[in-house]
Swiss-Prot record:
Listed Pfam families: Toxin_20
Predominant location category: secreted
Keywords: Disulfide bond, Neurotoxin, Secreted, Signal, Toxin
Protein name: U1-theraphotoxin-Lsp1a
Cellular component terms (Gene Ontology): extracellular region
Domain of life, source organism: Eukaryota
Key word Secreted present: yes
Length: 99
């Protein structure tokens, strides 16, 4: 039992050393570590706005279909009231979700 515990500790130590050295190498190559929130802030804001817009304006009847505004039964796409939630938004689980 002791040998199994010792082997597990040794393996974890090696993985930690490998991970640390790989991170240091990437930092040296890039000059800095990339922080995910830095570049996605503008896109995240647009996605949040689109999510709320779609959630409140959509009449969800069929799963997987494009989200459509409530009360719009016309097929005239030139009508300004006939908006679609575009950009990958679909009705799933009674919500408009981006895919």
């Amino acid at each position: 039992m002791r040998s199994l515990t010792l082997a597990a500790l040794l393996l974890c130590s090696l993985l930690l050393v490998f991970h640390t050295s790989a991170a240091a190498e990437l930092e040296a190559q890039e000059g800095h570590l990339m922080i995910p929130g830095d570049t996605d802030t503008a896109l995240e804001t647009v996605d949040d706005e689109r999510f709320f817009e779609c959630t409140f304006e959509c009449d969800i009847k069929k799963e997987g279909k494009p989200c459509k505004p409530k009360g719009c039964k016309c097929k005239d796409k030139d009508n300004k009231d006939h908006k679609k939630c575009s950009g990958g938004w679909r009705c799933k689980l009674k919500l408009c979700l981006k895919f």
